[in-house]
């Protein structure tokens, strides 16, 4: 009986474009989504002199563009430092997935924060919004690779660190427009 079930499942999997995984007790379902941590710098900030400025109109547009780029991804968590500009960058994507934005301490060593992210998440997409002086360190700690500094005038860089089933990291760098 079990071999007939397995043969049927093998045929269904081969005939279908979708992937399947066999879990404990023969439970069948889609394979787990690998973990991808998307790290971005906050969007454009207002040019006022406040210590904790909000996003500018262009920044709000970029935050909405980021949310649109992540719309079809299985976003499971969103993190930002405790500044308005980072929260406002993360909020549209988080809200689109029914998530609250979690706060992390930007002064925390990047390696420690990277370990926290890996311990807290094992699959899906995780969004992290940081600053020009913190994003390269976070990405480097996650991927174990060198990451160039971010110029203070540059916005829209996206760093996707994808972990395979064996925990190996692959970094993809792209740009999301406003």
Q: What does each of the following model-derived ranges do?
A:
Residues 1-4:
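Positively charged n-region of N-terminal signal peptides that target proteins for export
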Residues 7-16:
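Bacterial N-terminal signal peptides
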Residues 22-123, 135-137, 143-178:
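Active-site-proximal alpha-helix that buttresses catalytic centers in soluble enzyme cores
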Residues 126:
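Conserved beta-strand position immediately N-terminal to the Walker
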Residues 129-131:
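Short beta-strand segments
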